[in-house]
Amino acid sequence: MSGPWPSPDSRTKGTVAWLAEVLLWVGGSVVLSSEWQLGPLVERCMGAMQEGMQMVKLRGGSKGLVRFYYLDEHRSCIRWRPSRKNEKAKISIDSIQEVSEGRQSEVFQRYPDGSFDPNCCFSIYHGSHRESLDLVSTSSEVARTWVTGLRYLMAGISDEDSLARRQRTRDQWLKQTFDEADKNGDGSLSIGEVLQLLHKLNVNLPRQRVKQMFREADTDDHQGTLGFEEFCAFYKMMSTRRDLYLLMLTYSNHKDHLDAASLQRFLQVEQKMAGVTLESCQDIIEQFEPCPENKSKGLLGIDGFTNYTRSPAGDIFNPEHHHVHQDMTQPLSHYFITSSHNTYLVGDQLMSQSRVDMYAWVLQAGCRCVEVDCWDGPDGEPIVHHGYTLTSKILFKDVIETINKYAFIKNEYPVILSIENHCSVIQQKKMAQYLTDILGDKLDLSSVSSEDATTLPSPQMLKGKILVKGKKLPANISEDAEEGEVSDEDSADEIDDDCKLLNGDASTNRKRVENTAKRKLDSLIKESKIRDCEDPNNFSVSTLSPSGKLGRKSKAEEDVESGEDAGASRRNGRLVVGSFSRRKKKGSKLKKAASVEEGDEGQDSPGGQSRGATRQKKTMKLSRALSDLVKYTKSVATHDIEMEAASSWQVSSFSETKAHQILQQKPAQYLRFNQQQLSRIYPSSYRVDSSNYNPQPFWNAGCQMVALNYQSEGRMLQLNRAKFSANGGCGYVLKPGCMCQGVFNPNSEDPLPGQLKKQLVLRIISGQQLPKPRDSMLGDRGEIIDPFVEVEIIGLPVDCSREQTRVVDDNGFNPTWEETLVFMVHMPEIALVRFLVWDHDPIGRDFIGQRTLAFSSMMPGYRHVYLEGMEEASIFVHVAVSDISGKVKQALGLKGLFLRGPKPGSLDSHAAGRPPARPSVSQRILRRTASAPTKSQKPGRRGFPELVLGTRDTGSKGVADDVVPPGPGPAPEAPAQEGPGSGSPRDTRPLSTQRPLPPLCSLETIAEEPAPGPGPPPPAAVPTSSSQGRPPYPTGPGANVASPLEDTEEPRDSRPRPCNGEGAGGAYERAPGSQTDGRSQPRTLGHLPVIRRVKSEGQVPTEPLGGWRPLAAPFPAPAVYSDATGSDPLWQRLEPCGHRDSVSSSSSMSSSDTVIDLSLPSLGLGRSRENLAGAHMGRLPPRPHSASAARPDLPPVTKSKSNPNLRATGQRPPIPDELQPRSLAPRMAGLPFRPPWGCLSLVGVQDCPVAAKSKSLGDLTADDFAPSFEGGSRRLSHSLGLPGGTRRVSGPGVRRDTLTEQLRWLTVFQQAGDITSPTSLGPAGEGVAGGPGFVRRSSSRSHSRVRAIASRARQAQERQQRLQGLGRQGPPEEERGTPEGACSVGHEGSVDAPAPSKGALGPASAAAENLVLLRL
């Protein structure tokens, strides 16, 4: 044997000591010699650790605690006893960052030398904040055993792949859950312990169901207890995913397994994966399928499919982004660089500790720019601390040694050392010596010429190098001079601006320094009191623009998250200006104590005037040795960002307050400034609590180094992590190309005109194992949570938005939301997506967890979003991203005035936000009505963007069915309509596909906007309009051109198809008689229909803005369409029929409620009746049947208070008698029988003059149903549009006109092969019978009140009919009034041949049957 390794004989002496020497600790990994098999030796260490040893835990400043430490049986965590934390007294091996030997930690440094034997001491650094567990063992052998064993375990964890880590984590979580549930420690769980565990896991199951699963899992002679293996089987039964099972059925042709071909289709169509082969799918089956029988047959069952989707392959984060994938050869100024502020501090800015460990932590966390504040120390040794405060001090030498050790452990990209130099020239030379001696070759000392200062080097060129950022002597100083004067105005040390000593040294001014620090601390305390009284959240630093206006801000209401910063920039119309010393000058309305203001400006002190004079010529002495170490990162003072930079090798530092002023006043110039050189942003000096500001506005302006306080975990640090995780966490993220070249205004409403935007469609499907809030008072014994999900987009101000789902009551284990959220993003390259889970509470909401990631890091398809810091908690979503062209605007309506959120506030809010606002007026009113949205329904949200043009999916396959080709060009923009007729802003959103829904619809919303009806193809003509100088819309064949789409499954006809009356030419003519004014807007062919959100995800396209109509179109009601993202093809195929006539995804997944659209047809009011009557019948195309279409032979229903969505017709002139229903007999005589999709009659204005009021099905009485009998079979029909209902023949006394005949003809006739009709999609005869029954909704209204209102309505209608019957031949028709709020769904009607009515009326006086309108 050769080499430095000892002989096997020598191993008998001090085996553990020898093993520790072999295990070389290099940056968190273990380097082993391939010549040695160390398994038995390591096992001895593991055995000794599992047996446990007594050691002393040091806390610093007090006596140590004697505890018994041991490694648990799964080797997953270190535990100790005794402890008041009970089962929580543990440190996970996964959380350990480093194990160091000897007295190296800051805690050991507090004890005098000689207190402990260094060979018996070691420290364990763990957690996100690098907390240290400092232990003293009884002997050096014990210390070596623990250090060796822990390093070995850490090495194994670092080497395992992500899949093995996820499976190991799950196994450990199951074992830990089992142990914690085993209260009596007998190794098994009783039914009582299981019920307690289910409550802890937020599972709300009936006891009988739990007992049944318990009996099924209890397989060992049914002893009434569950062992660990039985518990795993029980948990597996309990956690079977219905959503994944339905998803699997879709792609397996309704089988309970997926073969390789089906799995390949799923990965290609849904997950948008390229290059998927059958061999790779077979490998997935082999890897994830737990059942040996399925594995041998090459099948993936539900368990294997669940394992795959919950593996890293199903995570929302792109696995390629775990590694560096961006171009790293661009100049440094083209990258965002993660930076730390006052890196050495572990707490606040005034009195906390300074530790060298913080440098090790932030560098290993990916930070590439650290700050070192250098001051003169005793004995000629420079020290590091926060100047003029009471923070502790550490040696500059120790800091540099730590940086040298940990700088390039995680990656080799350059580290920038930001030195804030306050030392004398003598100690500056000492600093330069330490930097040169310790860093050595890592220090970039390459000889570069100032002539090359036009371009910065790239991160790739500077790999493994440390750059010193600091002041540099000017070129006009002699090279022989060892020192020189430089400006001190570029200092980024904020607090010394108020505290810098003018005369004397620190010893003579010690009292003044302490007073300044105490005054700052006092201001912090008083500010906290003001926050508590004036606002529940912290203030934020903000500035006013010169005009005094806020301008465009981002979110004012941030979320109160656990452990996050708190604050808001605007409350109740007040702007809190975050500068203590400048509140009076800014005109703040909050009255602060005078002591906070005094002294900061130094106006009352004798030195205040001299200080102001000194600032005009603030200079300092700089050593030549230290100056020569600065190459590419020279610190300079910047007074005007519009001036051309003299060199790119310089860095300008701005406080957040100054940077905000620049952002508000000169955003485009600031962006250009950051293209030429580096800039660094640091927190305000008044963030003495080490809170963080929002970094996103500065990233929007291209600022490279946005320094944050890494010791303050919270929202802002989470945004920072998400930003830099997009490139492997290397600390460098490439800026978008538009930020590196060209100029744009990041604060404008359309920052990049002409460029494609992204539409993000997120379907929040379900959640898994969501825990109780961490700060819950009752802990695991608290109530089962009521979760909802909030999604936030953080980017440019125009992109910042948030949406949220409804609340699911009493289910945190597997809640199902099935809701679709849509976002528009102008610049996705810098946008972040933030998922938050909240627990709804009557008095607020509690934070459960979050996950933030870059927009570019999201994977499409069905993905799991694992909450940060939680082992099993996740939400299941579907992600779809499309390209959007055209302008985007918010659709506003009357409901939006009540339900939309507060006006966005300042982007600079450094806090998670404030508690949610009180319910709006409309929400409080609606809660008191019978049909009000309940707690389980979706809260009010802002409107979805309303699109002018279509979408184009960025995916290749699988989405071709779900898109609408964009139009040929931008359409004229119409003003937003507000009022009762417009929908709620949260209810309208762009539609990416048009697909008919089945007759089963929801009773949730009544949409009223008519869509363009079918019309004949007119000759190509260009509509002209002089209104406001609008350009004519393109017509002719070119106007109907659509971008080609790829079909994935079903073949489609590539020829243009008429849709909503659009002919081949696609030309539209404006309706004769309509006025050319601002209210009349042209319709466009490329207009994307706007849909209305309902609970079950049914969408109804509304009429595009404007007054243009197809030639001679009779205004039929639109068909019901579904959203591609809200109702994907896979859900449409879940019904046994297998056709498109299936319910939408959320109907099948989350709700049995149905939606009916009662879009009322416009009968041409305001149009020329002669023009309508003269339209030739033969030119009218067929009208598709629709469950939502009302019979157009009846006039519209009057608007009611309880249903403001219906269009108000009270302002219209009365309808003449010629618009009464006409007989269908002449036209029906020669027509073949066709099964209708469904018809629903509406009571007209003349029939029901009294405003109808809302009533749910649960309130109907027997009097509300008028039975009629079908001829032959005498089948009972409740006269509500059920199958079997017959139509009465109009008597001879009813006048006929062309308009009514056209409307009747469109209602009953349907052209064969018309693909726009829902009935043409199914086989012949389908849908005639067997439709679903009524869906009844409970209500709190009394039946007696309903009868009284129905009686009044009936009497009023009878009076109206008597008046109408005066001009008729024969007795008036006897009809019922509309009961208040009656609702019904005409699932499937029948159009039989005319037959005599069997009602009370005689044949001669029979009129058209008016069915009861049942609506919410």
Curated annotation (Swiss-Prot):
Bias kind Pro residues: ranges: 1011-1021
Positions bound to Ca(2+) 1: 182, 184, 186, 188, 193
Tissue-by-tissue expression: Expressed in retina and kidney.
Substrates-to-products reaction catalysed: a 1,2-diacyl-sn-glycero-3-phospho-(1D-myo-inositol-4,5-bisphosphate) + H2O = 1D-myo-inositol 1,4,5-trisphosphate + a 1,2-diacyl-sn-glycerol + H(+)
Localisation: Cytoplasm; Cell membrane
Active-site residues, record numbering mapped to chain: 341, 385
Keywords: Calcium, Cell membrane, Cytoplasm, Hydrolase, Lipid degradation, Lipid metabolism, Membrane, Metal-binding, Phosphoprotein, Repeat, Transducer
Entry EC number(s): 3.1.4.11
UniProt keyword annotation of Ribosomal protein present: no
Composition bias, Basic residues: 581-592
Domain EF-hand, chain residue ranges per copy: 169-204, 205-241
Regulation: Activity is stimulated by GNB1:GNG2.
Biased composition range(s): Gly residues: 1324-1333
Residue positions, PTM Phosphoserine: 487, 491, 595, 605
Protein name, as recorded: 1-phosphatidylinositol 4,5-bisphosphate phosphodiesterase eta-2
Protein's organism: Homo sapiens (Human)
Gene: PLCH2
